Amino acid sequence: MDGLTSIGTAPWSREQITHAVSTFEALYQTRPIQDNSGGMKSPHMFATWFMAKHLSPSVIVESGIFKGQSTWLLEQACPDAKIISIDLNLSQREYVSERATYFDRDFADIDWSGIDTSSALAFFDDHQNAYSRLQLCKWFGFRHVIFEDNYPATQGDCYSIKQAFSGAGFEPLGSGRHKETAGQKLARKLNLLPTLTPQYNRVQISPNQHDAAALRRNVEVYSEFPPLFKRDETRWGDKWTGTKYATPEPVLPATAKDNHTVFWEEALAYTWICYVMLKG
């Protein structure tokens, strides 16, 4: 499964992606937060803008706001959409939208019965367990989901969909983290509501094929958005090879780097952002 980058057919073509680059490049120059250190850079901002614009949902839920750049971006992509922005810490915002509705609660703790979740878009940039988030989306009726943090096996600070498909499990970085308990393992395998476990407690997930099998039963489309550029090395300093880090072909060839300097400089900010459409 290490080579998996897609399942099903994405609702856009590579040609459409390529043709949108120049429009986004002009938009990117107008971003309100020029230095978004710690947040999204051009590879994922382009991906998010393009996918949201193409899906054109009437409601967008974004989990994880940080400085607020993503809120602005979603406004540009879908000017008529209702945007619901949630983050446990709203104090970091530098851009505050007059259109968005803000909540300082977790995605799991909000009543979503007031919106048509089946046509809404859920955008996650909260560095949480993506497999558990997708379970919640299934329970709440969301079908269209974007995960900004989609790290490959052995990398990153959260359990990603890419890792789940690979069967590699997840090993938290740092100290003071907990191994997955027997109850948490059972809840995950039975697809039980992940709010049965603490939301912001990163646990070790042993290598397994259960999660990949459950994803295949419930996912209609899984599509990793291509990077704008692909460098020789990853952000972690090792070789960016297809064997270790399966990646869609980049949108732009390396020979075009002088014409897109910022995109080339920020190429290492790419972490396999993906779109997921759940089966209805």
Task: Tell me the role of every PLM-derived stretch.
Residues 1-122, 128-280:
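A short alpha-helical cap/connector motif
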